[in-house]
Amino acid sequence: GDLIERLKLEGENTPADIFMTVDAGDLWYAGTQDIFQSVITDTIQSNIPIHLRDPEGLWTGLSVRARTIVYSTDRVDPSELSTYSDLATQKWKGKLCLRTSKKIYTKSLVASIIHNQGQEKATEIVSGWVDNLAAVPNAKDSHIMDAILAGQCDVGLVNTYYFGRLIEETPDAPLKLFWANQDTTGVHVNVSGAGVTKHASNAADAIKLLEWLSSAKAQAIYGSLNKEYPANQNISYDEIVSAWGSFKQDKMNLAIAGKLQADAVKLMQRLDYK
């Protein structure tokens, strides 16, 4: 938010050629504030799948994080797990840990549920989540995993790279990922991404940088550093990430997560999701 406001204030005098951020909701919002210029090139279109970039070319995803279920291998049989909506059912009462509704990742996930299942069903799901909470929502995904390890809850929802970092440090931690919604919409994914600023003084070079960032070489670096999935799906994954297996992604265009963000916030406020 602060950087977007700064770019708006700087206008034509901005020194920034590229704006980069960590969530499609933020990228979409930046697009509504008229700080990007449209960049549609054959290189970016061939490297990055259509659902991971703005339909008008304002921004493109550069790395992918899936937001899925993490569970205690000591207390949960994976056959009990299935979907995001299943976590709203009675069997998870007092066993669920979630991240606060104030965080952009939560807003984007709920926005995707509104898009895929409608406002009424989304309300039912989020209401069930709130009823099933074992504790006040956490500030960070790492805190959710800490709470599961401490026995405070049995299941949670996290971005995959947080799990990757934990497993890198503690390979024998009794936690596993479960890919949600594999028989329906697929796992909700989000991106970190970037776009060329409207008043970029080095626009041609900025476009070249964006193209390079979408390339196999850059994507391999990007993914391995943060335990994320490459947005360019023509390259192999980091070793830790590969160990989690393949999964079906939700192919909703991520600009929709931005458009429905305000609806997601209102829904969560109405249900007192902290």
Language-model regions, residue ranges each:
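A structural signal for short loop-to-beta-strand junctions that line the ligand-binding cleft
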Residues: 14-19, 37-69, 85, 95-98
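Ligand-binding "clamshell"
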Residues: 30-38, 50-57, 166-180
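Periplasmic-binding protein-like
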Residues: 48-50, 64-65, 94-102, 126-130, 137-138, 212-236, ...
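An extracytoplasmic/periplasmic, membrane-proximal ligand-sensing/linker region
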Residues: 120, 228-274
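A bilobed periplasmic-binding-protein/Venus flytrap-type ligand-binding module shared by bacterial periplasmic
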Residues: 68-75, 189-202, 221-224
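Ligand-binding pocket segment of bilobal, Venus flytrap-like solute-binding proteins
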Residues: 101, 105, 112-180
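Early extracytoplasmic/lumenal segment of secretory-pathway proteins
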Residues: 1-28, 274
